[in-house]
C-alpha cells in the first residue's frame, strides 16, 4: 500500500513525462506545504526559473485559500512583467482542488492562459 506522498510523487513523474515547458509556453509548477504555497514558472529547455512567487513574505495572516489566491495574482503579475502570457499548468501531483485550484483561478483572472 502506498502512502499519500508516494502516490503524489508517482503522479508527479507520470505527468512530468507528458508535459514540458518551453520559452514560448513555460511550465507553471505549484508546490504546497502545510503552511505555505510556492509557484514557479519554469523554462524546462534551459532549466531556468522565469518567475516565482510564494506566500512566505506575506505580512498579514489570512486563510490558506485566500493566501493561495494572492500568490496566484502575484505570479500572474510577475509573468506579465516578464512577457509571459501562456503557460502549461503543472499541479505537481496534487489534486486540482482547494489551494491548487485557487492558485490556478487567480492566475487565470490575472491574465495568464493555460
UniProtKB/Swiss-Prot annotation:
CDD domains: Ribosomal_L18_L5e
Listed GO CC annotations: cytosolic large ribosomal subunit
Cited Gene3D superfamilies: 3.30.420.100
Keywords, alphabetical: Ribonucleoprotein, Ribosomal protein, RNA-binding, rRNA-binding
GO molecular function: 5S rRNA binding; structural constituent of ribosome
GO BP term, pick one: translation
InterPro entries: Ribosomal_uL18_bac-type, Ribosomal_uL18_bac/euk
Pfam families the UniProt entry points to: Ribosomal_L18p (PF00861)
Keyword Cytoplasm found: no
SUPFAM superfamilies with a match to the protein in the record: Translational machinery components
Role description: This is one of the proteins that bind and probably mediate the attachment of the 5S RNA into the large ribosomal subunit, where it forms part of the central protuberance.
Family affiliation: Belongs to the universal ribosomal protein uL18 family.
Subunit structure: Part of the 50S ribosomal subunit; part of the 5S rRNA/L5/L18/L25 subcomplex. Contacts the 5S and 23S rRNAs.
Name by which UniProt lists this protein: Large ribosomal subunit protein uL18
Source organism (scientific name): Bacteroides thetaiotaomicron (strain ATCC 29148 / DSM 2079 / JCM 5827 / CCUG 10774 / NCTC 10582 / VPI-5482 / E50)
